[in-house]
């Protein structure tokens, strides 16, 4: 059954999912074909069940999923619950890659791997400036990802401890939530 689900995906979407999220084919088939690449390298859902969602609260407690390092030796762990915009996720990813390229030059393409474990899948709505109250919620303007306390949004491997710590420090300045560096033991 899993093979049939993978057949519905285009080759490009599977390649993008495996390149940027580094997931297996089984996870891609569970995810479906609704994730596409747009606006440089930002991934977000092509369509959702509803076009507008309520804000909801970010969970303050620790969740079992995503609180342990799953892929790499180093990572960043969120210290508190919050929301990450798709722009902040992409900026943090680019800052990490830029740090590795400056520090490692030729070794970057051979050894280094970065995993982004959050996906901005909730639309944010907004109304234009100087519009009167009422008349609906507003049009979707961007995408966010909910991050709970203790969740690991970024992981990295194939680099030295000092380079990973420096890259995590640079990436922590991009999102609005506080993070700390974690190491696999």
From Swiss-Prot:
Record key words, sorted: Mitochondrion, Ribonucleoprotein, Ribosomal protein
Superkingdom as given in the UniProt entry: Eukaryota
Gene Ontology molecular functions: rRNA binding; structural constituent of ribosome
Subcellular location per the Swiss-Prot or TrEMBL entry: Mitochondrion
GO CC, alphabetical: mitochondrial large ribosomal subunit
First and last residue of the signal peptide: none
GO biological process, one term: mitochondrial translation
One Pfam family in the UniProt entry: Ribosomal_L16
CDD domains: Ribosomal_L16_L10e
Family membership noted in the UniProt record: Belongs to the universal ribosomal protein uL16 family.
Protein name according to UniProt: Large ribosomal subunit protein uL16m
Native source organism of the sequence: Zea mays (Maize)
Gene field: RPL16
């Amino acid at each position: 059954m899993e093979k049939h689900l993978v057949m519905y995906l285009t080759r490009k979407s599977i390649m993008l999912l495996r390149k940027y999220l580094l997931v297996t084919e089984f996870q891609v088939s569970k995810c479906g074909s609704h994730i596409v690449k747009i606006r440089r390298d930002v991934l977000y859902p092509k369509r959702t069940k509803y076009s507008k969602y309520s804000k909801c609260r970010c969970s303050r407690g620790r969740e079992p999923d995503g609180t342990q390092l799953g892929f790499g030796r180093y990572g960043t762990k969120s210290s508190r619950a919050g929301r990450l915009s798709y722009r902040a996720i992409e900026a943090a990813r680019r800052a990490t890659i830029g740090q590795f390229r400056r520090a490692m030059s030729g070794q970057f393409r051979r050894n280094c791997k970065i995993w982004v474990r959050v996906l901005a899948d909730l639309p944010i709505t907004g109304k234009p400036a100087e519009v009167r109250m009422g008349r609906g919620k507003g049009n979707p303007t961007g995408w966010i990802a909910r991050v709970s306390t203790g969740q690991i949004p970024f992981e990295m491997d194939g680099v030295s401890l000092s380079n990973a710590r420096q890259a995590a420090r640079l990436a922590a300045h991009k999102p609005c939530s506080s993070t700390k560096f974690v190491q696999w033991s």
